[in-house]
């Protein structure tokens, strides 16, 4: 299987990527006699040492604010402390963070995952296992990370990294380095199958990510004309956030622009899962789009319990904001059948396409085919549940067998109509640069997700 380049932008996105790569690490062979039955080259880069051993590192470009990397130093595992002190002027800009016990143990070749808890995993680097190349770690120097809040400007603390336009402006300071780092990563690939981006939609990261994506398409993918490559974007929505008007504008801007600039867009009410691993990106994309390239928003995403595998199963009903972070043992309130990460309410949905990724379970496949009254796509992945057994993955499930659902339905139209009304009633401001162009793009998407005649659209056009 060919390679995927992952771009992860923001602390929350980096938490999800850390779980993705910890899952990859669990499949690495640590002895010459180990059986390798997993394609580690999809998400990991390799380099050989003189003694014949192989180093694996994430094929990833991570972006975070100052102090967002916690205790991890950019060159920590590539240069000795003496070399750094001898060659560079070291400027201390804040209190140095100490590693937690888990990371100290990893440095000594030991695993102490039992020491991890909600208090010592505030940063994704607190439980990350793999060593990143220095070129993978990119920092926005003008902004400082603040847990549970938007980042703040280091010169003007009252300014927050909170709106689409701020991210858009900030990107241009890093455009040359971003393109060069991506080029270096791309040159290490033999046959790239696509690019996977994870970012936030409610903050300035949406604008930053969109500008980066536009540049990548223009520089490397013939401005999107070349359909050979898959560009997937996973957009994280903070469902706990009661957005102020500017944050709502930013969310709308991010959803519309990123959907127009990607080949498949997954807006999620919080988590990005790695259940797709092992299935070729182009296959899933073709089946979900079904020839409608502009209908590329996957607005319903669910993780279901596999009843075929267990009769005693429950999903923990928790605050989904904790899914990307490690959590303490959680008390079970009830046992819902699924975790719903969808952007849209799935009630009364009429589906354009629906895909399932399941374990190698023929009875489950037959059950799903009987349940649906229209053609569906079922992909089997024997590794879908591996991440649930990873020692750094949060303990959110009672059982260890799930499958995932990705759907495109007409219910997205209702969300889009709400967004259009919000923008229509807005005044021109710095967050919305071109109000009428944005309304036009939203209207275009509404048409794609409309089945049959819609009287409300006729009323809108007459206004």
From Swiss-Prot:
InterPro entries: DML1/Misato, DML1/Misato_tubulin, Misato_II_tubulin-like, Tubulin/FtsZ_GTPase_sf. Signal peptide: none annotated. Keywords: Mitochondrion. GO terms for biological process: mitochondrion organization. Gene3D superfamilies: Tubulin/FtsZ, GTPase domain. It comes from the Eukaryota. It is found in: Mitochondrion. Its main location: mitochondrion. The keyword Ribosomal protein does not apply. GO terms for cellular component: mitochondrion. Involved in the partitioning of the mitochondrial organelle and mitochondrial DNA (mtDNA) inheritance. Belongs to the misato family. This is Protein DML1. It comes from Debaryomyces hansenii (strain ATCC 36239 / CBS 767 / BCRC 21394 / JCM 1990 / NBRC 0083 / IGC 2968) (Yeast).
């Amino acid at each position: 299987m060919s390679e995927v380049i992952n771009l992860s932008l923001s602390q929350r996105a980096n938490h999800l990527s850390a779980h993705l790569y910890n899952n990859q690490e669990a499949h690495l062979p640590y002895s010459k006699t180990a059986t390798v039955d997993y394609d580690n080259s999809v998400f990991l880069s390799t380099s050989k040492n003189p003694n014949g051993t192989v180093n694996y590192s994430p094929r990833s470009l991570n972006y975070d604010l100052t102090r967002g990397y916690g205790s991890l130093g950019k060159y920590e595992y590539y240069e000795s402390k003496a070399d750094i002190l001898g060659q560079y002027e070291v400027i201390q800009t804040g209190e140095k963070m100490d590693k937690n016990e888990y990371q100290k143990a990893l440095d000594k070749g030991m695993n102490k995952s039992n020491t991890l808890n909600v208090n010592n995993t505030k940063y994704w680097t607190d439980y990350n296992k793999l060593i990143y190349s220095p070129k993978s770690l990119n920092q926005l120097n003008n902004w400082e990370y603040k847990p549970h809040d938007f980042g703040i400007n280091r010169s003007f603390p009252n300014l927050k990294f909170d709106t689409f336009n701020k991210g858009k402006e900030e990107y241009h300071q890093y455009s040359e380095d971003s393109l060069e780092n991506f080029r270096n990563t791309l040159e290490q690939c033999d046959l790239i199958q696509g690019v996977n981006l994870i970012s936030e939609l409610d903050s300035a990261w949406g604008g930053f990510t969109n500008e980066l994506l536009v540049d990548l398409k223009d520089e490397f993918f013939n401005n999107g004309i070349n359909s050979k490559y898959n560009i997937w974007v996973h957009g994280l929505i903070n469902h706990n956030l009661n957005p102020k008007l500017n944050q709502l504008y930013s969310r709308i801007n991010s959803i519309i622009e990123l959907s127009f600039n990607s080949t498949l867009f997954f807006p999620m009410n919080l988590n990005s899962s790695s259940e797709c691993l092992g299935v070729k990106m182009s296959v899933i994309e073709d089946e979900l789009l079904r020839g409608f390239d502009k209908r590329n928003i996957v607005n319903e995403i669910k993780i279901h319990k596999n009843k075929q595998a267990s009769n005693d199963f429950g999903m923990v009903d928790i605050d989904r904001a904790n899914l990307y972070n490690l959590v303490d043992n959680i008390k079970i309130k009830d046992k819902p059948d699924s975790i719903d990460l969808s952007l849209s309410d799935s009630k009364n949905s009429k589906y354009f396409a629906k895909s399932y990724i399941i374990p190698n379970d023929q009875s489950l496949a037959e059950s799903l085919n009987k349940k649906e009254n229209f053609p569906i796509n079922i992909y089997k992945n024997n590794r879908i549940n591996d991440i649930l057994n990873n020692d750094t993955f949060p303990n959110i499930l009672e059982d260890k067998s799930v499958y995932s659902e990705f759907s495109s339905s007409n219910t997205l139209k209702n969300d889009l109509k709400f967004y259009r009304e919000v923008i229509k009633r807005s005044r021109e401001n710095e967050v919305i640069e071109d109000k009428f162009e944005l309304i036009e793009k939203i209207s275009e998407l509404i048409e794609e997700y409309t089945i049959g005649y819609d009287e409300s659209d006729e009323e809108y056009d007459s206004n």
